A protein has these predicted regions:
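Short, glycine/charged-rich "phosphate-handling" switch motifs in NTP-dependent
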Residues: 58, 70, 79
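Single conserved hydrophobic/aromatic residue that forms the stacking wall/gate
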Residues: 1-5, 9
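Helical segment within the ABC ATPase nucleotide-binding domain
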Residues: 24-39
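Hydrophobic Walker B segment
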Residues: 53-56, 88
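Short acidic-hydrophobic catalytic motif
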Residues: 74-78, 86
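Conserved ABC ATPase "signature" C-loop
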Residues: 64-65
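Glycine/charge-rich catalytic "coupling/switch" loops of P-loop NTPases
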Residues: 105-162, 190-219
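Conserved H-loop
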Residues: 39-46
Length: 219
């Protein structure tokens, strides 16, 4: 039966899960257009973070039945509340490194990466100097551009290209920092191939730091 509530509220539970990839993309666009035309409030349930990011005006990220974060797709992507959200939202996922904060640097094994002044002040102010911590950074915030390497020399690491995947406009470059694997999203104009030794730099203004015990973002 129709009611005022049913006219303004719709719930869709993984409606695209059984479609092939191409049709899923097409149907995403159709659902978005339908939603804007009908102006209904729709709760869309999905395990596909790409669907969530592209279709939602607001996201509710849940784990084991508990809400982890609520916000716009942009805010959730750029400011994840914890390691779970950072690792779930985004493809490829956020990179995570275990290490320590030491006198303005993030240290993982023999690698030292200089913190931005803002992050150094935040972490020192919260008492994390000398403590174990989790450092997170998105693949697109790791660069092989010569200008970036020159501009931020204290954020540069030596990297061996374990795997290099060309996706068209970009390379997905897989390497390791210490024993921790990570992926960098590099412009395809760079001349890269598997097996190379290269240098990469981390944009530490885009870095996130998480408490090792709680896995919550430090802010």
């Amino acid at each position: 039966p129709s009611s005022a509530a049913s006219d303004v509220y719709k719930r869709q539970d993984e409606p695209l899960s059984n479609l092939d990839a191409k049709l899923r993309v097409q149907m995403r666009a159709e659902i978005i257009k339908l939603h804007h035309r009908l102006k209904t409030t729709t709760v869309y349930v999905t395990h596909d973070q790409t669907e969530a990011m592209t279709m939602a005006s607001r996201l509710v990220v849940m784990k084991d039945g508990l809400i982890q974060q609520v916000g716009t797709p942009k805010d959730v992507y750029e400011n994840p509340e914890n390691v779970f959200v950072g690792g779930f939202i985004g493809s490829p996922a956020m990179n995570f490194f275990q290490g320590q904060v030491k006198d303005g640097y993030f240290v993982a094994g023999e690698n030292k990466i200089k913190l931005s002044p803002e992050k150094a002040s935040l972490l020192n102010g919260q008492g994390y100097n000398g403590k174990d911590i989790i450092f997170g950074i998105r693949p697109e915030h790791i660069s092989a551009d010569p200008e970036d390497l020159t501009r931020t020399p204290e954020s540069v690491v030596n990297a061996h290209v374990d795997v290099c995947e060309l996706t068209g406009a970009e390379f997905m470059v897989y390497s390791t920092l210490g024993e921790q694997q990570y992926v960098a999203r590099i412009n395809a104009d760079s001349l890269l191939e598997t097996g190379q030794n290269i240098q990469l730099t981390f944009d530490m203004s885009k870095a996130h730091f998480f408490d090792k015990e709680t896995e919550s973002r430090i802010r």
